[in-house]
């Protein structure tokens, strides 16, 4: 047998397999010798032996097969043996890993223990070092004391009358007296010593000395160190204010208290050692610390002294007086400051105080620069600053009773967040007061004299009286600023800027001649605006909620007010040569300012209601940049004025005299009556209005200006002599603006304008269009100005424009009931996106037809006669009767109206109607023969009968909300803005109220 049954080392587990292998070996003539010989040998030797047998040709084939089966059995045995060895190795490795883990845990615990020991040793080392340093410090202190005592003994020899001890060499106490010089010297040296080296004075002048052995006893013998029965450490305050003395039992004591007491210094710390001086309770100083905790008065600093102080005291009654050439710096967080320092000429006291109460501010003379950063809650009296002083105050005070009076050539800068300011500073000539205040109440503003520039940045809630600024001054209000790097010095004819966020303004500033007050206020109430004299430019950017009376500004003034006020009852009256500018977002404006000759009122208001607009005299220019919700009456502006208005509603537009340029950029919702502009004026209606009831009538030489939101303008305007190009546009790119001759003002509000019109003399092309492309603009002849870019929802009556005028209607109109009649020499501009035009218009000499229409069907286009340029941009759905335009006129039909019932009759002219209408029943553009006149009259009668029908049968009209003045579609039963329901009335129609 090759293998034995039951041998687990063979690798075989089944007896059948072992029996089959043994039978094969025996059948082939083999023997168990090969298996037994290589049983314990490795597999390499078994394989080498098998190869030798197989390769030998002399060995029979049967023997080869028997050896092969034996080698197979040996291979299985080798594999089983290797598996056992591998299992043993794995077990050993697992044990080794466990041992390593245990070792690591032990090492970790040892490491933690060593770390704790290291920390303890380090702590002990630090404590030892601290103790050593303390010992060294004590040693140095003792050495210093010893040296001081020896030096004092060398300087002042000891008295010769002393009593020796009972035995030779025995030390005993000796009492003696000190003269006045010795006492003063000792006191002086004691005051110069450190705090830790102070020695407590004794009630009697008793000193202990060793008995002298030679003539030189001063500092040669060691002192007798006696132990006190009650040792007191250093820096220990005496409970009763009495100095502590160490009673020593001397053998012999000579006391002379009666003679010594008058010679004691009044106060002081005496040198260390065993010296003990006599002093009374009234004459002794505090025994431990000489730091004062209360100071009744400031020290007087003389000329050329720099006194820095950091006072955080709770009460400071009297301020320091700093003479000329001083710079006192105080950083005080005191709660109450009753009297501030008075600083003479040439000083600069910067005070950075966050005090809660400031009753009197410093009076600073000439060439001083006071700097104050105060967050005080109450300021009763502000500093009076003389000539050439620059007071700079950054105060967040809540109450300001009296503001500083600043003299000539001063620049006061105040950054105050005070809540109440009762009286503002009065600043004389050539002063620049700058105030950055967030005060809540301002009762009286500063009075600033000639050539002053007060600058105030106030977020005050209440302003009762604004500053009165004299000639040449300029109050500037820079508010809500966190830092002010450089403050300008502005001389005569300056521009004061004011930005105040006050909630209540009762009386505004009165600014004299050559002043420029500028106020940017977000106040909630303003009762009276400033009165500014000649050559002043008051600029107010106020977002106040209530403005009862606006400033009255004299000649040559430019009042600018940017207000977001909710109510404005009376606007300023500005005299000749003034330019009032109002940039207001007010909700209610009852009376606008009256501006005299050569004035330019500019207002940018988002007010909700404007009852009466300013009346501007000759040579003025009122500009109303307003986003108001309702404007009842627009200012009447005389000759050479430019009113600009951006309002949400305009009930009555201004009447502008000769040579005026009224500019109105308005997003008003309703316009009941448009301005009547005389000769030489230019009314510009930059409006995105929802309803326009009456469009202005503009006479000869008028310049309408348009506020454009155009995205591209390729060619810029060339404006000849006497023109005023005003581009108040929100354009993304400006490539080329039109070339406009003399006395023209081009204003375009278009998205793209590839080529602008060439307009002759006395023309002003203004385009306020959001059109996407305009490839070629009109060529307008002399004396005309065509501008009708309108997005109006309803237009009840269109203006009648005389000769040489320029009518501008920027509206998106849904219904156009009555078209305008335009006389001779007018140029209508049409921006229409028409889909189909079967027959183009025939335009005679000197005509520029521009038709860009979105109309669905246009069967026959108009025939336009001489000197007529009809431009229609209409998206109307139905056009029943078209207008007849006389010679030299231009029909402007830039409307996206839904219905157009009846147009006006325009003789001798054929208008260009570019409409998005579904059907055209009657076209007046045809030259009808006499046989068709009867049909034409019948159609007129039918249209008149349809026009006389009740409102229920007519097309729906947009309705305006009475609360928010928002325009709504007829299908809307609820206001889209304020969400209020419209109510029906008795006559069958619908009343929005």
Swiss-Prot record:
Transmembrane segments: none annotated. Residues 353-364 have a biased composition (Basic and acidic residues). InterPro entries: TEX13A-D_N (IPR028193), TEX13A/C/D_Znf (IPR049534), TX13C/D_rpt (IPR049367), Znf_RanBP2 (IPR001876). PROSITE patterns: ZF_RANBP2_1 (PS01358). One of its GO terms (molecular function) is zinc ion binding. Residues 325-335, 944-957 have a biased composition (Polar residues). Keywords: Metal-binding, Zinc, Zinc-finger. Residues 281-381, 520-547, 894-959 are annotated as: Disordered. A zinc finger (RanBP2-type) spans 955-984. The keyword Metal-binding applies. Belongs to the TEX13 family. This is Testis-expressed protein 13C. The gene is TEX13C.
């Amino acid at each position: 047998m090759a293998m034995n049954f039951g041998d687990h080392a063979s690798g075989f587990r089944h007896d059948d397999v072992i029996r089959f292998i043994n039978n094969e070996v025996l059948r082939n003539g083999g023997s168990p010798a090969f298996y037994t010989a290589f049983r314990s040998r490795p597999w390499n030797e078994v394989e080498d032996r098998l190869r030798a047998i197989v390769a030998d040709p002399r060995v029979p084939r049967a023997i080869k097969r028997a050896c092969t089966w034996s080698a197979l059995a040996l291979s299985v045995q080798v594999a089983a043996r290797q598996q056992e060895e591998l299992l043993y190795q794995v077990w050993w490795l697992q044990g080794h890993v466990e041992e390593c883990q245990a070792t690591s845990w032990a090492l970790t615990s040892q490491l933690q223990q060593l770390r704790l020991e290291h920390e303890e040793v380090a702590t002990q080392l630090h404590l030892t070092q601290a103790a050593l340093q303390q010992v060294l410090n004590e040693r140095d202190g003792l050495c210093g004391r010893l040296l001081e005592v020896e030096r004092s003994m060398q300087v002042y020899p000891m008295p010769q009358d002393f009593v020796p001890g009972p035995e030779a060499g025995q030390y005993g106490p000796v009492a003696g007296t000190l003269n006045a010089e010795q006492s003063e010297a000792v006191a002086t040296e004691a005051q110069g010593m450190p705090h830790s080296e102070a020695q407590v004075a004794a009630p009697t002048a008793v000193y202990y000395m060793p008995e002298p052995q030679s003539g030189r006893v001063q500092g040669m013998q060691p002192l007798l160190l006696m132990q006190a029965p009650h040792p007191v450490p250093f820096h220990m305050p005496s409970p009763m204010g009495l100095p502590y003395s160490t009673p020593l039992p001397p053998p012999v004591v000579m006391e002379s208290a009666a003679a010594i007491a008058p010679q004691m210094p009044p106060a002081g710390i005496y040198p260390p050692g065993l010296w003990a001086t006599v002093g009374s309770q009234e004459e002794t100083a505090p025994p431990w610390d000489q730091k004062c905790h209360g100071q009744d008065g400031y020290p007087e600093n003389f000329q050329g002294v720099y006194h820095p102080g950091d006072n955080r005291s709770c009460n400071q009654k009297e301020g320091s007086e700093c003479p000329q050439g001083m710079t006192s710096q105080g950083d005080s967080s005191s709660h109450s400051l009753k009297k501030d320092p008075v600083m003479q000429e040439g000083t600069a006291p910067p005070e950075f105080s966050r005090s809660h109460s400031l009753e009197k501010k410093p009076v600073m003379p000439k060439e001083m620069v006071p700097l104050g950063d105060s967050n005080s809650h109450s300021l009763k009296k502000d500093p009076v600053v003389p000539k050439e002083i620059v007071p700079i105050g950054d105060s967040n005070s809540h109450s300001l009773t009296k503001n500083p009076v600043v003299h000539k050539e001063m620049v006061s800068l105040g950054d105050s967040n005070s809540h109440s300011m009762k009286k503002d500073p009065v600043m004389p000539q050539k002063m620049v007061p700058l105030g950055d205040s967030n005060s809540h109440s301002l009762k009286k503003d500063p009075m600033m004299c000639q050539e002053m520039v007060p600058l105030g940045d106030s977020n005050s809630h209440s302003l009762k009286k604004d500053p009165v600024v004299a000639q040449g001054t300029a109050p500037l209000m820079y508010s809500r600023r966190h830092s002010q790097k450089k403050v300008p010095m502005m001389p005569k004819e300056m521009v004061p800027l004011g930005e105040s966020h006050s909630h209540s303004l009762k009386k505004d500033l009165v600014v004299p001649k050559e002043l420029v007050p500028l106020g940017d206020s977000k106040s909630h109430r303003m009762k009276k605006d400033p009165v500014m004299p000649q050559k002043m430019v008051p600029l107010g950017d106020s977002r106040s909620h209530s403005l009862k009376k606006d400033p009255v500004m004299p000649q040559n003034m430019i009042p600018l007010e940017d207000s977001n006020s909710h109510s404005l009852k009376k606007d300023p009256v500005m005299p000749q040569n003034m330019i009032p500018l109002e940039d207001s977002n007010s909700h209610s404006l009852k009376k606008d300012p009256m501006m005299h000759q050569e004035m330019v009122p500019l207002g940018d208001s988002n007010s909700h209601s404007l009852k009466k607009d300013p009346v501007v005299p000759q040579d003025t220019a009122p500009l109303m940049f307003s986003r108001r919700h309702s404007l009842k009456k627009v200012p009447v502006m005389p000759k050479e004025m430019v009113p600009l208005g951006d309002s949400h509603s305009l009930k009555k537009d201004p009447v502008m005299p000769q040579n005026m340029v009224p500019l109105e950029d308005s997003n008003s919702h309703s316009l009941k009556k448009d301005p009547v502009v005389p000769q030489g004026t230019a009314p510009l209606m930059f409006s995105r209005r929802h309803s326009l009831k009456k469009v202005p009538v503009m006479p000869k030489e008028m310049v309408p200006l348009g506020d454009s939101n155009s995205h591209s303008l390729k060619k810029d305007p060339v404006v000849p002599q006497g023109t005023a190009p005003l581009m108040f546009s929100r354009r993304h790119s400006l490539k080329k603006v039109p070339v406009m001759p003399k006395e023209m003002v081009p204003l375009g509000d278009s998205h793209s304008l590839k080529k602008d019109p060439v307009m002759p003399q006395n023309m002003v092309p203004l385009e306020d269009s959001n059109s996407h492309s305009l490839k070629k603009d009109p060529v307008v002849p002399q004396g005309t100005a065509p501008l009708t870019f309108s997005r109006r929802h309803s237009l009840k009556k269109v203006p009648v424009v005389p000769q040489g005028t320029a009518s501008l209607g920027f509206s998106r109109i849904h219904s156009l009931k009555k078209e305008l009649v335009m006389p001779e020499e007018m140029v209508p501009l049409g921006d229409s996106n028409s889909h189909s035009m079967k027959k183009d218009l025939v335009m005679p000499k000197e005509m520029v037809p521009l038709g860009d229409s979105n109309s669905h069907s246009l069967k026959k286009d108009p025939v336009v006669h001489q000197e007529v340029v009809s431009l229609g941009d209409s998206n109307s759905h139905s056009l029943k009767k078209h207008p007849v335009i006389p010679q030299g006129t231009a029909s402007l039909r830039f409307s996206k109206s839904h219905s157009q019932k009846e147009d006006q009759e325009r003789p001798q002219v054929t208008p260009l109607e570019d409409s998005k209408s579904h059907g055209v029943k009657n076209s007046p553009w045809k030259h009808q023969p006499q046989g068709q006149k009867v049909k034409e009259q019948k159609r007129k009668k039918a249209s008149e009968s349809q026009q006389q029908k009740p409102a229920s049968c007519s097309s729906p009209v947009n309705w305006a909300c009475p609360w928010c003045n928002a325009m709504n579609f007829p299908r809307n039963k609820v206001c889209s803005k304020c969400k209020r329901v419209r109510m029906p009335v008795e006559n069958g129609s619908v009343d929005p109220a």
